[in-house]
Each structure stands twice: as C-alpha cells, then as structure tokens.
C-alpha cells in the first residue's frame, strides 16, 4: 500500500513538472462487446434470475474507463491519474459500439487530454456494467459489473491505432487506442512546442519533430533577424526586413561602405565620417582653394600656354589668330570686309585672302583693269580715272557699289516705329503710320481723341503715353466699354450672395438677416413667438368679453321675448273670461262724436291709470270693416279722471288679428240691436230709425277726421300690439253709443257683460259701470 502511494505521489509530481510544457490526447475507440449469455460477472442474470437453456437475460451495458500510470498489477480503484470517464448505456448484451449517440452524450473514440509529457507507458482498466435504467449509471455496486478488463502497455506517440482484444469469462471486448500530440506539440512525449508565426516574435514554420524552420530572408534562433542585402557592410549597415541595406549615421552608398565627408568639402576625401582630406593641388578648410589651376582645369584653349598666377587664377598666352581670357575666341580677319569691288574674303590663320572679280586686282581688289572709256558706272554714276590706275564711280543718290550697281534700300534699317509700314523711295523712305501716331518715323503720338475712342459717354484726354478716358458712373476700362459690376464692391453683408439684375444688385440673405444689404439681424423666431404671446392673450381676452356681451344681449332678448309672451298669454286669459273692473271715468262726450268705451264683444278694459290712446283698426272690405277715427270736440276723456283720451286709427292691421276684429264687429252689431235704452229723466225709448240716422252722421264725421289724422295713424301702428284689444273695445263702445243715441240722458246695458253706459245730456258725460 505504501509503495502504491509513493508511486502515486511521484506520478502527480511528474505531471506537475511537465504540465506547463507539453500537451497530448489519449484516444480510446471501443469497437465491439460480446455478452452471449447476458449474465453479470457473478453469472447471474442481469435482471436477477438465473440463465436457462431457453431464455437469455438482457444486460443494458455501459462502461467505466480508468487510465492510470503504469502499474504491474493495475487496480480499478481510483484515482485514475491520467483520466477517466463513464459512458452512457451503449447497447444490450452483444453489440457494436456506435460512433455517436443521437442525443450527443457519447462520442467514439473517447478522448482524455494530457497537460504534461507523455511517459510512454500506461495502465488501462475497462469495466462493463449493467444499468437497471438508462438514467442510473452508478458504478459503486459491484454486483452490476459484467466484466473487468485490464491492460498495461508501452505506447509511442503517433497517428497509428493499436488494436487489442480482451476475453474475460463469457465476455469479449474489442478496442483500439493511440496517443497523439495536440496542435503545435511535437516529439516523443509531445513536449516540444512549436507554433508557426510571421510577426515581430518570429518568422518560421515547424518541422515534423517541432524544429523551427525560418522563412526565406530570416535568421536567428527564432527567425527574428532579417538577412540584409548581400554585400551590405555588417558594421556600417543594417536592415529591418530582408533584402535591404540601411546605413548607419556617417555612412552612405548602396552597401553603406562610404563615409560622409565634412559638409562643404569640395576636393577632399575621408577615412572616417565628417573628414575633409584635400586632394593634391587643393587647399583650405573645405579643399576649395586650387593650388594648381592650370593642371586641374586646363583652362587655356587652342594650344595656348597656361600659367598659374595664384590660388584659383591663371593666365593664357594665345596663339596668333586667337583671343580671349582662355584663347577661346578665334580672330576672323574678314570681319572688317577688307575685300573691295565685290571680292570674296577667305579667313586664314592669322591672315586673309581676297578673291577679286574680273577686271579687278590687288590685295583687297582695289585696283581695276578697266578705264572710264569702258563706261563701267551704272545708274547714272559719274566715272573718274584713278591716278594710281583704274577708275572710280561717283554714284547718284539712292545707289551704291563700285560701279553704282546697287540700289540703296532705305527701309532695310527699319526706321519706322510703332508698327508703321515703310515704303522705299528713290532717295528716302515713307512711313505709313497707324492710327494715333505721327512724324516721319511714326514715333510721335498723334491726336488720338479725334477718333472718339471713349465709349458710353466717356471723356477723352491726350497724354504723353497716349489718350485716357474718364468714364461715367457705371462703366470702366480703357475705352469705358465695360460696365461696372454692381456687386464689385461687395455691398451685401453677413455672408449674403450678390446678384445683378437690370443694372442693379439684389442681395440673397442668409437665414436670420434682412434688409437691402442684409445688414439687419432679424429677431429670433422663438423670441418673436414669445413677444407675440401677450398680444395673443389680450386679443383672446377682448374676444371673450365680446362673446360675453353677445351672450348677455341674447339672454336679455330671450327674457324680453318671454315677458312679452307671458303678457300676451295673460291678455289671452283675460280675453277668455277674466273680468276686471274699469274705474269710473268722467269724460266730456258729445253725441255728434262716436266717442264711447265699449266693453262688449272682445274683452274687459284694464284699469291702467294713465293716459292711453284708443284706436280702432279696420281692414279692407273683405273683413266687412273699415278704418275709423274718433275725436271729441273738447278735450279727450281720460280714465281715472284723466282729462284726455286720444283716439288713433291704425292703417295696418296684421292679418292674424283681422279675423278676431271681424268677429268682434259682428258681435257688436248683434249686441247693439238688443240693447235697451232707458231714459233716466223721461224714460223714452230708442227707435231703430234714430239709430240709423245717428250712424250716418257719425260715418261722415269719421271720414273727415280720418284724413286729418292720417299722419298720426303711422305712430299708432307701432303701438298696435299693446292697444289692439283696447282699440277694438273702443270701436265696440262707439258703435253701441251711436245705437243708443237719445235727446235725453240714456243708458245702454250690455246684456253679455251686464255693463251700463250712462250718458248725460247736459254735460255730455258718459259713465260706464260694469257689474262684477
């Protein structure tokens, strides 16, 4: 037991030491399991019964795998130092082990990862167990064990599988296994780590055993050093990537093998950076002083002799026929045209030669073999004999040459200026001047303003350099031909855009500015809205007050309408049967006037105790009535002892009341016939004849009165609604009074309302009493 514990501790220590530098996987592939009888290791049926000749037990088989360090006598007891696992139920009795299960709970081969160097040996224990159910996979119960298979082997790292077959009792298990390194791990124990990379930490790939293989252009242990350009100076050059050669400070060149001289050094060399070692013949700090100019530069040309005269100076001794500081100029003896009379000159070394035309001879062809007798002069030239022999011609104006054979071209010297055209004359020339210039050679500016060059009303002024136009406002240019841009002086402010339209400018303002030149800052919209709020509130208040006033007016109109409606309703109620008492009135009545107060036919008269106008309305003939007006001879009678009663005639009666009045008139005529008159003094009776006479008299008088009161009738129309019932009553009373006319005081009794009209003959008074 102590030995086993020691081995276990040793294995754990070994794994801890190797874990950080190695990695691999032990793979176990279960292939086939056979349990022909379907019994457990104790030979009992997996379901608890004994096996018989005609019945086979069913063993739901799963496996427990334990991988340990090498043990001569491997024990299935934990711990499993290299790893272990329990599979789900893979089949019953004899079956082929699948690669996977549908639910993904099992993968074949079984992988057990290593974090340490593979030792090369192992112990493998595989137990086949029976499960009562697929969920119950406990391994502690020994009665569930079907068989136990133990293997101790030596195993090298590789991709090849090792096959194995174990037979225990009535069971048989076929399986295979191998140990492979993880990615980037190599070697016999997967202890060599190598991961290919191409970055600042290295540029390499890995070999079969994990060795580093540098990429092209790289070197070093981890391939971090680039290989520079071949030939690059290892001391004075370096490279950051393969194939280049960068020089260190003080060196230059393709291979960084040249030192840099001192700045400004002209004719010197260096052995180390920043030196200036002068070459032979040069001196000074920068080796710029030539101590042997003739040797270094050879400045003298054309065979001249050079002599050094000091630092950077020399003198050339020229050969004949050459001149200049370096004898670079060849002297041409023909430059002065030494040959005369048309002879041609040939330049020779340090001399010249003239080739004379026929008839001439001499070094410069100055002698002629002809005489004046030969007439050699042309174009009117005068011939004269030369005392030395020969002749000479005196040419007229405009001709030249030995024989006056050449016509002089006066325009050959281009005497005309300012683009004038030159015309050659016999003895002179003529310049045709362009506009604006005068003079023989067209060199003077003429009167240019005479050509009116200034346009658009400009004023022309002559000047020394030509004319000048003073332009009117709106135009510019030399001739005032260009209109001035209105936008030229940028009249628009605050970033606005200027546009020209119809000889004026328009400014397109940016947002927030206004005015002709966009010079005004417009108020912010939010502040403007805020400033509008009080005026909105005031306007809302005024509108609310107006609505309230209108509402009050509507209410007042409605109330007044209801009051008038109620008044009409009360009058209708009175007309339907209510009796009111009319106070005794004292009136000055005249029998010749149809003045009476009637209470017959329509409704009782109210006691209103105030002056009131009585009017009677009569419509057209279709209503069988006519308008009438009554007026007393004296002051009108008043109710309640009031001394005036006015009678007015309506000229317009509403159609809705016409029917009522017509009915009242009919009732009046019927009632008056039934009135019985009694004399208060002598008890005389009214006759029908007297009543008719009285009615005729009244009718004529009413007609006259109607015409005189026509203007007053309009005023009575406005009061028709308030006095319509009183007017009808007056009409009825008048008719009744006429019917009851008598010489003596008489009384009229209204049989319907039991009213009595008393008329006094002496005072012409009418007293009306109503019995209540």
UniProtKB/Swiss-Prot annotation:
Principal cellular location given in the protein's record: membrane
Residue numbers on the Cytoplasmic membrane side: 558-772
Tissue: Expressed in nervous system. In the developing nervous system, it is expressed in overlapping regions with deltaB (dlb) and deltaD (dld); in the neural plate, dla is expressed in patches of contiguous cells with dld, while dlb is confined to scattered cells within those patches that will differentiate as neurons. In 24 hours embryos, expressed in the hindbrain in stripes adjacent to rhombomere boundaries, but not in the actual boundary cells. During gastrulation and tail formation, expressed in embryonic midline cells. Expressed in hair cells of inner ear.
PTM comment, free text: Ubiquitinated by mib, leading to its endocytosis and subsequent degradation. Ubiquitinated by the ECS(ASB11) complex, leading to its degradation by the proteasome.
Extracellular side: 21-536
Domain EGF-like: 225-257, 257-288, 290-328, 330-366, 368-405, 407-443, 445-481, 483-519
GO BP, sorted A to Z: angiogenesis; diencephalon development; embryonic pattern specification; floor plate development; hypochord development; inner ear receptor cell differentiation; midbrain development; negative regulation of Notch signaling pathway
Subunit record text: Interacts with mib.
Protein name in UniProt: Delta-like protein A
Organism whose genome encodes this protein: Danio rerio
């Amino acid at each position: 037991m102590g030995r086993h514990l020691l081995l276990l501790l040793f294995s754990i220590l070994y794994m801890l030491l190797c874990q950080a530098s190695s990695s691999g996987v032990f793979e176990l592939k279960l292939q086939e399991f056979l349990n022909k009888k379907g019994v457990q290791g104790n030979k009992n049926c997996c379901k608890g019964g004994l096996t018989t000749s005609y019945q086979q037990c069913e063993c739901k088989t799963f496996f427990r795998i334990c991988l340990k360090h090498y043990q001569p006598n491997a024990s299935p007891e934990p711990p499993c130092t290299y790893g272990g696992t329990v599979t789900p139920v893979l089949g019953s009795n004899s079956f082929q082990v699948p690669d996977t299960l549908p639910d993904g709970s099992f993968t074949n081969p079984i992988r057990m990862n290593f974090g340490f160097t593979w030792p090369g040996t192992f112990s493998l224990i595989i137990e086949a167990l029976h499960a009562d159910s697929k969920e119950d996979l406990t391994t502690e119960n020994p009665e569930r064990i079907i068989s136990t298979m133990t293997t101790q082997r030596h195993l090298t790292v590789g991709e090849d599988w090792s096959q194995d077959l174990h037979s225990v009792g009535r069971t048989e298990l076929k399986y295979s296994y191998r140990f492979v390194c993880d990615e980037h791990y190599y070697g016999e124990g997967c202890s060599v780590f190598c991961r290919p990379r191409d970055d600042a930490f290295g540029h390499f790939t890995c070999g079969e055993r994990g060795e580093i293989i540098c990429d092209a252009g790289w070197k070093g242990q981890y391939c971090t050093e680039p290989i520079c350009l071949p030939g690059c100076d290892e001391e004075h050059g370096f490279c950051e990537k393969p194939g280049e050669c960068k020089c260190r400070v003080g060196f230059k060149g393709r291979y960084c093998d040249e030192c840099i001289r001192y700045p400004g050094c002209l004719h010197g060399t260096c052995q180390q950076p920043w030196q200036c070692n002068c070459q032979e013949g040069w001196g000074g700090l920068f080796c710029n002083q030539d101590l042997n100019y003739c040797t270094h530069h050879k400045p003298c040309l054309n065979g001249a002799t050079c002599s050094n005269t000091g630092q950077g100076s020399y003198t050339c001794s020229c050969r004949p026929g050459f001149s200049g500081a370096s004898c670079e100029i060849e002297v041409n003896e023909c430059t002065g045209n030494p040959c005369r009379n048309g002879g041609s000159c040939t330049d020779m070394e340090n001399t010249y030669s003239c080739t004379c035309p026929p008839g001439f001879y001499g070094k410069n062809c100055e002698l002629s073999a002809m005489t004046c007798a030969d007439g050699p002069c042309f174009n009117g030239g005068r011939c004269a004999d030369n005392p030395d022999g020969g002749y000479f011609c005196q040419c007229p104006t405009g001709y030249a040459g030995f024989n006056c054979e050449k016509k002089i071209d006066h325009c050959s010297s281009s005497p005309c200026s300012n683009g004038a055209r030159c015309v050659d004359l016999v003895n002179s020339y003529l310049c045709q001047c362009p506009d604006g210039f005068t003079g023989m050679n067209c060199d003077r500016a003429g009167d240019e303003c005479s050509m009116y060059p200034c346009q658009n009303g400009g004023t022309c002024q002559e000047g020394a350099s030509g004319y000048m136009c003073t332009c009117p406002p709106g135009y510019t240019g030399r001739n005032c031909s260009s209109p001035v841009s209105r936008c030229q002086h940028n009249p628009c402010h605050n970033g606005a855009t200027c546009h020209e339209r119809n000889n004026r400018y328009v400014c397109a303002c940016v947002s927030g500015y206004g005015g002709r030149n966009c010079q005004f800052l417009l108020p912010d919209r939010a502040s403007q809205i805020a400033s509008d709020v009080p005026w909105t509130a005031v306007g809302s208040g005024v509108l609310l007050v107006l609505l309230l006033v209108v509402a009050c007016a509507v209410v007042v109109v409605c109330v007044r309408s209801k009051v008038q409606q109620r008044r009409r309703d009360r009058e209708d109620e009175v007309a339907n049967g209510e009796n009111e008492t009319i106070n005794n009135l004292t009136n000055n009545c005249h029998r010749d006037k149809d003045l009476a107060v009637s209470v017959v036919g329509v409704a009782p008269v109210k006691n209103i105790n105030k002056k009131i106008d009585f009017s009677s309305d009569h419509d057209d003939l279709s209503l069988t009535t006519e308008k009438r007006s009554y007026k007393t001879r004296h002051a009108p009678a008043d109710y309640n002892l009031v001394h005036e009663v006015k009678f007015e005639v309506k000229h317009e009666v509403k159609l809705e009341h016409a029917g009522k009045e017509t009915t009242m008139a009919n009732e009046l005529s019927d009632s008056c016939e039934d009135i019985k008159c009694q004399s208060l003094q002598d008890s005389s009776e009214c006759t029908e004849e007297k009543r008719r006479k009285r009615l005729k008299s009244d009718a004529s008088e009413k007609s006259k009165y109607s015409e005189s009161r026509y203007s007053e009738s309009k005023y009575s129309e406005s009061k028709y609604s308030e006095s319509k019932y009183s007017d009808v009553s007056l009409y009825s009373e008048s008719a009744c009074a006429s019917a009851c006319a008598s010489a003596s005081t008489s009384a009229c009794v209204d049989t319907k309302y039991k009213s009595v009209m008393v008329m006094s003959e002496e005072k012409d008074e009418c007293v009306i009493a109503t019995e209540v």
